[in-house]
Amino acid sequence: MKFKGKSNIIKEVQSKLGLKADGIDGPATWKMIWENLIHEDKGEPEKPETPVQKLKDDYPEVYKASPNQSGPIKPKYVILHHSSGSHDGTRSWILNAASKVSYHYLIAADGSLTQFVYDKKRAWHAGRSSWKGVSGLNGHSIGISFYGDTNKRTPSAAEIDSAAKKCKYLMDKFNFGIDNILTHEMIAPNRKNDTSNETYQMVINRIKEL
């Protein structure tokens, strides 16, 4: 393998910099290299990537109508759920009429949401349920679900943030307070275990920050 001599390399550099290509690496040559190559980028230094997931002001949302719905309702609660299955599996199940199950919203790992039932329509998510004298929470609440089992997996920061922002939006839209953000277990004790207490507290704490 042949290598070019030092003077030939210097000549090439000088030529690219618009200098006289004499092959002499004098002060003028190094000054131009410094100004035009090393300092070519005058912008901000590139920031290293961070493993912390960036949170968003708004999360992408799509609507896919579930056949499992009725209505209308006047929402005054949000019920947090988990599905126990994968995100895609849960999505398919909700779109299947045979399941007779639906949530208003399902949250993906990146915080994006799929809405299956409009806010003022009845989704079939609560089943036999009651809370402070109110029974049949399907007729009074909006169901938001994480995928998987939150007693076995901790939702991502984006999932928690997305859930909290959707809850806050619904609180403002329908004029109810944070005490009306509940879990499926709270309205159906001894029958349901979703979501985990940890997940619930993370959502509540994030809502308080908004």
What function would you assign to each model-found segment?
Residues 1-41:
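A short amphipathic alpha-helical interaction element
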